[in-house]
Design a protein with these regions (language model features):
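Conserved N-terminal catalytic core of the sugar/cofactor nucleotidyltransferase
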Residues: 2-5, 31-102
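N-terminal "arm"/small-domain region of PLP-dependent enzymes with the aminotransferase-like
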Residues: 241-297, 385
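Conserved core segment of the aminotransferase class I/II
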Residues: 149-154, 445-487
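Conserved core of the sugar-phosphate nucleotidyltransferase
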Residues: 112-196
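Short loop-beta-helix segment that forms the pyridoxal 5′-phosphate
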Residues: 298-299, 310-332
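PLP-dependent aminotransferase-like
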Residues: 335-392
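N-terminal nucleotide-binding beta1-loop-alpha1 segment
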Residues: 1-19
Length: 487
C-alpha cells in the first residue's frame, strides 16, 4: 500500500496565509496540515508516500524532508499548477498508481487517524470515505444505495438542498486497489483529461465509473469521526476549535463563536436556553412558504414592527421597541447611566459586560445557595447608592424566581429610591407563574421601570434575532429607537 497526496494548489481563498506557502503548510493548533497527515500515514507501514506538488513546492519539499518521516517520500512536480486542476496533478502520478494499492488524499484536509484505519481495515478493495452531508459542506456529493454502492456523483452546482438528507459528502480520501487503478480508473482518467482538458476534477472520473454500474468502487460511511476540509479562513477557524488537544482551549474557542453550533454534531449545549417545542411545524412551513419574499424584499421598518409588537403583547406601540435581539437593547439601556449599577450574580453576563468595572455593584448569592427574594435585594442595595438595578427573572443560570407580588414591591421600592429598574424576563415563560410584566398593570407603576425580553428563548427562534424593550417612558424609548437602524 502507498499513499498519494495532492498538494499542488495555490489556496487563494486563504489570502495572506498562502502568500508564501501552499495551503497544506497552514497550521491548525500549531501543527501544519501536511505534517499532521504525514505523521498519521507514517504509522501505517506504507511502502511509500508520493506528494504531487506545485505552488511554492521548494518550501513544501524542504519542510517535508525536515520532518524525519521514516516512510519513503517521493515528489512529483506540477509545473503548470496555476493553469490546471487536480485531474492533471493526479494524472502526473498515474504510472505510480498502477504499481500498488493506493490511499489517495488531498492535502487541505485535517482528519483524525481513525479515518485512515477504517480504510485499511475494510476488506473491500476500493473505497471512498463519505460523511452525511451537512448544509455548510462544500464540493462534490454522492448518492448511495443500501449496499454502499455509488449511484451518482453530484457536483456542487447540481446540488438540490431539498434532497440534502440523501446526500453524502466525499471526504476526499480514497482507497484504490492496484487492479482498479490499472484497469479502470487510470484508463478513464487519461480519456477524460484528453477529452475535457486539464482544468477538471478527478472526482468527475469517479462519476463516469459510477455510471457504468460495475460497483467496483464503494463508499465507507463515517459515523461521527472528525475531519474538515480547509478552503478559507472560516474553515481554518472551525478546524482550530475541532482539533485542539487542550479541552479548556477548545471550550474557549467554541464558546467564543456564540452560536453556529450545528457545525459540531456531537456538541450538547447546556448554555443557550431555547424552547425545544417551538417553532411549530406549521410556523416553519409558513416561513418557508414566504422565504423568497422575506429575502428578496425590504422588510417593514421600525414603526410598523413596533405596532406589531404592541399588538402581540397587548400594549401601546409607544411603550415598546424591537431590537436586533435583546442584546442590542441591553447595550443601549446600559449606556443610559454613568452611575452605579446593581447586579445579582451569578447572572446573564451581557448586562455586566456592557458597563464599566467601576460602575458595578455586585450582590453575590453563592453563600445564599443561589436563592434570594425581592426583600433580600432591597436589603442589600439599600445603602449602595445605585442609580440602576438589573434583575433577570427567572435568573440564568441559577433559576431563582421572584414572584409577581415581590416584583410589584420591588418596583415601588425602586420608585421610592429613584432607581431605574431593568427587569429581563426572557426566561419567564419557563416558570410556573404565567403572568408577564409586559403589561400596563406593571409598566404604569413607574416611569423608570423597563422590561426586556428575548423572543429567541420562548419561541425557539434565536436565528431570527428579535428582542423587545417595554416601558411607560415613551420619550426614552423614542430616544433609544432613534439610535437603532430603521430595519
Amino acid at each position: 500500500m502507498q499513499a498519494i497526496i495532492l498538494a499542488a494548489g495555490m489556496g487563494k481563498r486563504l489570502g495572506e496565509l498562502t502568500k508564501n506557502n501552499t495551503k497544506c503548510m497552514v497550521e491548525v493548533d500549531g501543527v501544519r496540515l501536511i505534517e499532521r497527515a504525514l505523521r498519521i500515514l507514517d504509522r501505517k507501514n506504507l511502502n511509500r508516500i508520493i506528494l504531487v506538488v506545485g505552488y511554492q513546492h521548494e518550501n513544501l519539499m524542504a519542510f517535508v524532508n525536515s520532518l524525519g518521516i521514516q516512510t519513503q517520500i517521493g515528489f512529483i512536480i506540477n509545473e503548470v499548477y496555476d493553469k490546471s486542476n487536480n485531474i492533471f496533478s493526479l494524472s502526473l502520478a498515474k504510472e505510480q498508481m498502477i504499481e500498488d494499492d493506493t490511499l489517495l488524499l488531498e492535502s487541505d484536509l485535517i482528519f483524525e487517524e481513525r479515518l485512515i484505519d477504517m480504510l485499511l481495515e475494510d476488506k473491500r478493495d476500493s473505497l471512498a470515505l463519505v460523511d452525511k452531508f451537512e448544509s455548510w459542506m462544500d464540493g462534490t456529493c454522492m448518492l448511495l444505495d443500501e449496499n454502499d454502492c455509488i449511484v451518482d456523483m453530484v457536483a456542487k452546482k447540481n446540488l438540490h438542498f431539498v434532497n440534502a438528507d440523501q446526500y453524502y459528502k466525499t471526504v476526499n480520501i480514497y482507497k484504490f486497489s492496484r487492479h482498479f487503478s490499472k484497469y479502470t480508473y487510470v484508463p478513464f482518467l487519461k480519456a477524460y483529461a484528453m477529452a475535457m482538458g486539464n482544468n477538471e476534477y478527478y472526482e468527475s472520473v469517479i462519476r463516469l465509473i459510477a455510471m457504468l454500474d460495475t460497483k467496483e468502487l464503494q463508499a465507507r460511511r463515517l459515523n461521527g469521526q472528525r475531519w474538515y476540509e480547509i478552503d478559507d479562513i472560516q474553515d481554518l477557524d472551525i478546524a482550530e476549535s475541532l482539533f485542539t488537544d487542550n479541552t479548556e482551549e477548545q471550550y474557549k474557542k467554541i464558546t467564543a463563536r456564540y452560536g453556529g453550533f450545528w457545525r459540531y454534531p456531537k456538541l450538547v449545549d447546556y448554555c443557550y436556553l431555547v424552547n425545544p417545542y417551538f417553532p411549530t411545524e406549521h410556523m416553519l412551513e409558513e416561513i418557508r412558504a414566504n422565504s423568497d419574499r422575506l429575502i428578496m424584499q425590504y422588510p417593514s421598518g421600525a414603526r410598523v414592527i413596533r405596532l406589531l409588537a404592541g399588538k402581540l403583547f397587548g400594549i401601546s406601540d409607544k411603550k415598546i421597541i424591537v431590537g436586533n435581539g435583546a442584546a442590542e437593547l441591553i447595550r443601549e439601556m446600559m449606556q443610559e447611566t454613568n452611575g452605579k449599577i446593581g447586579f445579582v450574580t451569578p447572572t446573564f453576563e451581557e448586562y455586566i459586560n456592557c458597563c464599566k468595572q467601576e460602575q458595578r455593584v455586585i450582590m453575590d448569592t453563592r453563600k445564599m445557595d443561589f436563592s434570594y427574594s425581592g426583600q433580600d435585594i432591597q436589603d442589600y442595595f439599600e445603602q449602595k447608592h445605585i442609580q440602576m438595578l438589573v434583575l433577570i427573572n427567572p435568573d440564568n443560570p441559577s433559576g431563582n424566581y421572584i414572584d409577581s407580588r415581590e416584583i410589584y414591591e420591588l418596583i415601588h421600592w425602586c420608585k421610592k429610591k429613584k432607581i431605574c429598574l431593568i427587569l429581563d424576563e426572557s426566561f419567564s415563560d419557563f416558570s410556573d407563574e404565567a403572568e408577564s410584566c409586559i403589561a400596563d398593570s406593571y409598566l404604569e407603576l413607574y416611569d423608570e421601570f423597563y422590561v426586556i425580553k428575548s423572543i429567541s428563548k420562548s419561541y425557539g427562534v434565536p436565528g431570527c434575532r428579535l428582542g423587545i424593550l417595554a416601558g411607560r417612558n415613551s420619550e426614552k424609548l423614542d430616544q433609544i429607537q432613534r439610535k437603532l437602524p430603521i430595519w
